[in-house]
Amino acid sequence: MSEEVADNAAVVPKSRPLTKAEKVQAAGMKYAEKKTTVFFTDSTIASNLDDFATFNRDQLKLGKVLGKGRFGTVYEVMDITLAPKQASDDTWLIEERQFIHDHVRREEGSGFHSGDARYAIKILSPEVMKDSGLFIQGIYDMAVEARVLSDIEHTNIVKCRAIAPVSPLQGAEFYLMMDRLYDTLHKRMSKWGKKQKRRGSLLGRTFLDKGGKKEEETHLKKMTCAYDLASAMGYLHNRRIIYRDLKPENIGFDIRDDIKLFDFGLATEMKESRLADPSDEYCDVYKLTGMTGSPRYMSNGTFSKLSFVSIFRFLSITTTT
């Protein structure tokens, strides 16, 4: 899919002049387009957006809000209306659209989470559309996330299933459809903490956790989460992709309770043009922007606004026991 910004005429009818807000959005789209072009110049991250099934926004029936970030809101997808097939449609994409349509909800009476939506979409929040600064950053983040997700695949990274048939820079019209997640590590850690307190009491040790089996199960789950998360981060680092916003709120669990890393708007790439000293063939230090991510979870260097990082620094993961 082309990432070029559509002409203003394609966004606003010619019968009336652009409003001030529309002019700001149009300028924001052009700025975000230039920023995105620079970001992906000489990139090894391929744009595979044309390989995804597409649905117009009006084909999707949305349900409740599942989550909300600084720029985007995530809704469950309750139903999809299929549009008439076009002669130019690729056979594989027709089949993919049909599959997503047929499996948009889990079967009633199937047991665990029966009738639930299988998919969720991420779109720009309404309030972001009204703020020029947030709008520019929001569509830029969506463009980065769309391209990154289109070119990565890992068991513990959320999978993109479909996209809108417009550029990510079109703002309100663009969305990413992904597998629905049911929990975050942030919420799970809170549950683990409460269970730990209950098991720590005399009553808990006597009746709730005979032989320490439940505590052992929880510890095993924590270690599995740490291992799977390290696997996902290792995959990204091998692709020279730096996630930059690792925190419990951006780590979820799917229907099978497998851990999934999501929200790639702040991801960046270690490419040769960012080398601190391109003339040094052994240089492993890259130029990056400081203060990117969530302050509470930033590394000391990032929080201190250091603009250099080595590709060989190790990821440290701490689990509570």
Describe these PLM feature segments:
Residues 11-54, 63:
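Juxta-kinase regulatory segment immediately upstream of eukaryotic protein kinase catalytic domains
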Residues 96-100, 112-118, 123-151:
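Conserved N-lobe beta3->alphaC-helix segment of eukaryotic protein kinase catalytic domains
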